[in-house]
Amino acid sequence: AKLIEEVGRLIIPFSVSAPALIAASAALDRTDFVEETYKNNFIEKRKLQNFFTRQGYFFYESQSNFIFVKLPFPDAGKKLEDKAILIRNLESFGFDKDTYRISIGNSNENNALINVLKSFK
């Protein structure tokens, strides 16, 4: 048990696989891809933040490709998973049990998320 605790301290919370690192390195060589991805993330993050604000959901400001948001209904992660939308619960990282990490997707993915969240009210 002690060894498992020690190993757990060394592992980063959102680890990245070797193939993902190789793909990311190759993507960085394509400046057009990087610029398009940056633009998409900026636009789509604003769309999600505006939606969360209108719905009264608390979220943490983000400078990355994800948002931490408190979703005000029980079992939000499971309900979204049932609709083929995966989000990560952040309770094990010290946040409230209703706080989730939502990655910024493309316009269609984010619209699907918004539509499903609207249906939960």
Regions picked out by a protein language model, each given a short descriptive name:
Residues 13, 87-91:
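Short beta-strand/turn micro-motifs at beta-sheet edges
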